[in-house]
């Protein structure tokens, strides 16, 4: 299996300014993400940065980078430019690891790439894990996904799906022998040819309604393969509180990667 990990990194962040460079026990966050990705089976790991400050910090730790434009409207556009700068071919596979996931499990990166490699009918792949708590199922910030028999995504939603007609608002999976609902995990693998096309596709009405970019792919008829992991990934960093939590985990030398 051959694939490249791309980590988009931009300094602008409304909730946490200069987030990629946030210090986590002496190491910039984006560097910690790259160090985790380097433990995967990826042929190479590259940070797609929007400024020289990120590139200089990464270089100090031996992390490969490419400099992308600052005016990209989405992370997908930045990744597509990075693929061109790296000379990747249309049939190559890239895994998009978010730059705010410093505890990403390297085995999960491999699993998502492997899932796409095994599904030539799919343009991209992602991951999901089971939901146990009703509060998570009902939380619109927890994105749910429903699959077909081959673990291909049918739909992603902020709504509680699938909905049990006779057990609305309840933890229906605790009644009888029913499979648990699935929470989407925000890691993606793409075939490079599709990634180059994706930013040019018109936004889908459902994408705009749910504010979920992956619905654009489904709307335009592309398939998304889904790897089901047994455990939730490590915490990401969106707020100062998240950052402090990750710092404590690293300082305490906690177990940083759940098994896939």
From Swiss-Prot:
GO cellular component: cytosol
Xref: InterPro entries: Cytidylyl_trans, KdsB, Nucleotide-diphossugar_trans
Domain of life according to the entry: Bacteria
Leading EC class: transferase
Gene Ontology molecular function: 3-deoxy-manno-octulosonate cytidylyltransferase activity
Localization annotation: Cytoplasm
Main location as per UniProt: cytoplasm
Catalyzed reactions per annotation: 3-deoxy-alpha-D-manno-oct-2-ulosonate + CTP = CMP-3-deoxy-beta-D-manno-octulosonate + diphosphate
GO biological process: CMP-keto-3-deoxy-D-manno-octulosonic acid biosynthetic process; lipopolysaccharide biosynthetic process
E.C. designation(s): 2.7.7.38
Record function comment: Activates KDO (a required 8-carbon sugar) for incorporation into bacterial lipopolysaccharide in Gram-negative bacteria.
NCBIfam families: kdsB (TIGR00466), PRK05450.1-5 (NF003952), PRK13368.1 (NF009905)
HAMAP family: KdsB
Protein name: 3-deoxy-manno-octulosonate cytidylyltransferase
